């Protein structure tokens, strides 16, 4: 969900080309609905270099491969690594000679939350955010909601009080 939201946000902020890498067919198609200009099944199929790469997967293998896609003065933003994961190998010379900037993002401040709310108020109707919640359950059906989420792997499930 973060990757799709970031895709939509980047497009509203004037990004000229947003490329999304997603192994899942359905989620790749959703990326187009959220403004992606290009989609790819895997990192290896991407041609060229990028000014910025944002990782929402948290996959160590994806991070190692994606960092090589950065152009000189590129920025790599790690968002999806919020749990312990395997260590990655970085080439310090590549980072230094190419003036690569690494940024880690975790949590948010109140002004970040306000900016997100403003984005949804101003641009939310341009993108199918409601479709990200695939099914809704009442709180008394919480076990069914968890089973559904584990079995179907939806982007989001809603549980109502």
Where are these regions (language model features)?
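C-terminal hydrophobic helical "lid"/dimerization subdomain
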Residues: 110, 114-161
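Glycine-rich phosphate-binding loop and adjacent beta-alpha segment
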Residues: 60-122, 161
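N-terminal Rossmann-fold cofactor-binding loop
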Residues: 21-23, 56, 106
């Amino acid at each position: 969900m973060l990757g799709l939201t970031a895709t939509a946000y980047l497009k509203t902020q004037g990004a000229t080309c947003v490329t999304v890498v997603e192994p899942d067919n359905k989620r790749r198609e959703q990326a187009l609905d959220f403004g992606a200009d290009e989609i790819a099944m895997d990192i290896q199929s991407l041609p060229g270099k990028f000014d910025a790469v944002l990782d929402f997967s948290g996959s160590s293998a994806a991070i190692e491969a994606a960092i090589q896609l950065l152009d000189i003065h590129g920025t790599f933003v790690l968002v999806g690594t919020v749990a312990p994961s395997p260590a990655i190998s970085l080439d310090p010379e590549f980072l230094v000679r190419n003036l690569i900037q690494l940024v880690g993002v975790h949590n948010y401040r109140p002004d970040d939350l306000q900016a997100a709310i403003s984005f949804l108020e101003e641009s939310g109707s341009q993108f199918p955010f409601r479709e990200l919640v695939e099914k809704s359950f009442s709180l008394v059906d919480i076990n069914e909601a968890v089973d559904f989420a584990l079995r179907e792997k939806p982007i989001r499930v809603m549980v109502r009080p």
